[in-house]
């Protein structure tokens, strides 16, 4: 999926995450993470975001993630929403996304 514009999903409320995604002109994935639990869960959060991006077919993007204690399901949901908004996609393929949980 091609990232065409800047998009944001989520909030800075407790137990949430704000994901900002923008085009990166074919330079791969650049991920910046700001989290209160960086030392404990930073590697896991980064891996989860990168896995979600790969499943969506995103090969190039700049992602800024501000974590406020979000659970895995919230991190995935915010990443999916931000990618679809940034790509200009209006319809989700729910069957594909649901198959990730098999």
From Swiss-Prot:
Key word Glycoprotein present in the record? no
Where in this protein does the record say O-(phosphoribosyl dephospho-coenzyme A)serine is found? 14
Arranged from A to Z, the UniProt key words for this protein are: Cytoplasm, Phosphoprotein
The listed locations are: Cytoplasm
Q: Which Pfam families match?
A: ACP
Name the HAMAP family on file: CitD
Summary of the function given for this chain in its UniProt record: Covalent carrier of the coenzyme of citrate lyase.
Q: How does it assemble?
A: Oligomer with a subunit composition of (alpha,beta,gamma)6.
Q: What is this protein called?
A: Citrate lyase acyl carrier protein
What organism does this protein naturally occur in? Streptococcus equi subsp. zooepidemicus (strain MGCS10565)
